[in-house]
Structures are given as C-alpha cells and as structure tokens.
Amino acid sequence: MTKLRTEDLTRILRAYPRAGSTELCARLNGINRATLTRALKTLGDAVIVRGESRRTRYALRRPLRGNAAPIALYRIDEHGQGREIGQLSFTFPEGAALSFEETFPWPLDGGMADGWFDGLPYVVNDMRPQGFLGRNFAHARALDLGVSDNPDEWSDDDVAHVLATTGYDQPGDLILGEAAYRRFLDYVRIGADRFLAESEVETSYLQSAENAMRHGDAGSSAGGEFPKFTASRLVNGRKVDVITKFSGVDDSPAVRRWSDLLVCEHLASLTLPRMLHVSSADSAIHRYGGRTFLEVVRFDRHGDFGRSPVCTLSSLNAALIGTGGGAWPKTARMLQAAGWLSDTDAAKVALIWWFGRLIANTDMHDGNLAFRPGLALAPAYDMLPMAYAPMRGGELPNREFSPDPPLPADAPTWRQAAEASVYFWNICAEDTRISAEFRRICDDNARKMAALLARMQ
C-alpha cells in the first residue's frame, strides 16, 4: 500500500472510530479486505482492535499526555492481593478501549462488551476524586499534576492521568496504572501500623479535623457539605477503615445544627436495618474538643489492605441508562427492566428512597447510592434530614415538614418507609446528643408523620 493510502487509512480511522472492515473498505474508495488487512498491519500497534468475527472494530490509538502505551488496570482482592485484570487505551477522537484479562463483573451494554467506551470505563470514572476530599486533593496536587485545582473541571484525560499517577486509594478495588500500583505497594510496606487504638482516636481526630480545615475547603459546611477525613481504626479488635465527618468547633446555631445532623445520620443508619431490613454502613458518634465526629465504616475495605468492588448509581446511570439523575426508584426500575437489577434490590431502593423523602433528605443524588457487582445493593449511607441544613451564610432554614402521601402503586412501600420514619423521628427527639431546639422539630415531625400514616392505613 502506498504512503498516501496509509495516510488515508489514518485519516478515516480518526474520523470514523470503531468502524468495521466493511465500512472502512467503503470509505477508502471500495478497496478490498486484503488491501485493508495489509494497511492495518502496516499501522501496527497504532490501531486498536476489539471484538470478534463480525463484531470486530478498529480505532486509532490516542496518546495520553504524549504516552500511547496501554495503562494496566489492577484489582485488589479482599486479602490485599493485587493482579492485573486489563489494559486501558485511548482512542481518536475521544473515548477508550479496555482489554479484559478476566471476566468483568459489572454490566456491559452494547459496544462495552467488546471493550469500547465513549469516555472512561464507568467503573474507572467512578474512582475520580470528588467532593470535599477530592477538592482537598486537587488543591494540594493540581500544580504538580498539571490539572485544574477544581476537579469538576477535569476532562477524562485529566482524570486518567491523575488516577494513573497517584490514585492508589480510590473507592472500590481498582487501581489504574503501574505508578499508582507502586504507591499501593509502598502503602502496604509502611501502612500496617496505621490503625488507631481507642486511646489515640481523640488526639488524631482533632488534629485531622484541624488539618482538613487548614488545607482544605473551609467553606464546605456553608456550601451544604460536611468536611471530612479518612482514618484507620481498631474497633473492638477489628481493623476498619473509616470516613469521618465532623462539625465546627464553636457553639453557633449553624454549628449546632450540623452537629445535630451528624447524630441524625448515625440514627438513620441504625433505623434502616432495624425497621426496613436494609443494610447500612456501620457508624459511631464521638465528641472531642467541641466537635462532633461521625465515623462511617467503609464497606469497600477489609482488614489490613483488602478491598472490594463498588460503583455508585451516578456512574451506572450515566453508562447504562442515561437519565441524568432523578428519583432512585425510577432508575432502579429501568435497571430492573434491563435485567441488571433484581426485583428484591429494586424494592429495597424504593424503600430507601421513600424513607429518605419522609425524613426530609433533600440530597439523594445518584452519588449517594452504591452497588456491588451483580448489581447487588451496597449498604446505604449519607441518609439524613438535609432539608434542615444551615443555608449558605449560616442561617437556619424555617421549613415546614410536609411529607408526601403516595400514589396507590407506591402505597405498600410508602407505609413501610413511613413506619420507619416515625421511629427515626422519635429516636432523634429522645437523643440528648441532639440540641433541644432540633429535638422539638424531630418530635413535631414524628407526630405529623404518625398522623399521616394513620390516615393512609
């Protein structure tokens, strides 16, 4: 094949990614398949091939920051042992291709089954730094990594670069890139003694909170989000990794309310399994140095270094459904109809969502619901009455609690969730770790909810 024809093939592959041989031959002025095959061989590793037989497609390899080599994808198992499970490559003009070294445990729709993705593979995208911890990381490392200090502005290429360079401790069980995996090995080498004894927790937590506020987003609570840090603990002899949220240190009305909400989140995590038989993340409340700390056990971490897979509804929805958020039960029904979500877990999603509605949780975005492979519902988390969170500037909202009655089809689920919400509001009203003012609100809400439930029986 002439040099010009090679350039023509490169041009067509750039313009028409994931084209099959029939399409490529047609776009190259009707050349035959033998000529195409020779041309593809000439381009060598510059061409990515995925799929078998009639599903075979071709794309032109795109470098990531000047490096066109595939990036290894590793998995860490529950015992802390790692292995390579695939290789990630980037394609022109955008998107990625993933080779699978073993069975992929997450749903794959359409071309994803052959390894083609419009952006990053959704389980990799789910690892991206975000929220308070992500912003703290970006503020600290943006200059070194050549990315914006706002992770919301990162492109897929930025995310891949950051993960492949530094992402050894992201949510779930995956690590992207050899450099990040070597960081994990360093972590294993020096991190076995990281677990805090009970006697060390107070000092460590107070220092971690101070560090988070000094180096992080000091306006987080004002913006409707708890500041937080990660830690490793010995709890009754058990090694656990935790995410710890904390309140401010003064006695202002806004800080008291944030403290109240942390206790409410802990009580909601107790209510879900007790009243609805829905698993929730283990949690505990601590009071140190004028701050309230909510310690939430990570369900994707096990023992010294073990990990397990997890993916949020946000990434699953974007990749498989594309509804862009909305009510969890609606998205769950769509996953159920596609055969990815069981009837049992779809029903549990509806229960969790209605419970959230009836405890005034106005922050049930798709990032606050997660799944394990299968898709099996992961323990619930971030469930609290966010309608009562202080507004930006610290003013407390004066909101009337007006719970929604259900449509007939939702009535059985609603009643179960309503009974659980009455229980929740009552235990909040009785918990002296919550301020007297907010306990009165909780008591009033329990009465309103009980009255509505009685009318709906």
Regions picked out by a protein language model, each given a short descriptive name:
Residues M1-D8, R14-E23, R27-Q457:
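Phosphate/dinucleotide-binding and metal-coordinating scaffold of catalytic cores
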